Amino acid sequence: MQAQNLAVVKGLVSVAWADGHVSAEETEVLEALLEAFHALPSEAHELRKFAQTPRSLADVPIHELGFAARRQLLQHAVLLSYVDGKQDEQEKAIIEQLVQALEIPPLEARDLVRDSEERSKLLLKLL
């Protein structure tokens, strides 16, 4: 598993914990990403262990994320914030913090978040 993908998953763990718990739906998304990123069994074990306790953006190795991976993390974070049926205030707040931490320009971030929210809401209708 590439270091950038590891950092993306860790970032998503912090988003999942934003509302104080990790839902079953959020766990499913994280597990799917481990598979999609071809995590080795040892890496998957490490990330599952990492996800067992509350995490914040301070726990995310953002410096390991390149240009595209930063945007990927933001888009996945928005999706993850909706996967349990609704985006709550804590999840909105961590996405705003994530935009700052990822150093994505405000206008670009606004468009990425808006597009991701629209896709997330459409996907929710399919579930």
Language-model region placement:
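Small-residue-enriched hydrophobic alpha-helices in membranes
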Residues: M1-L127
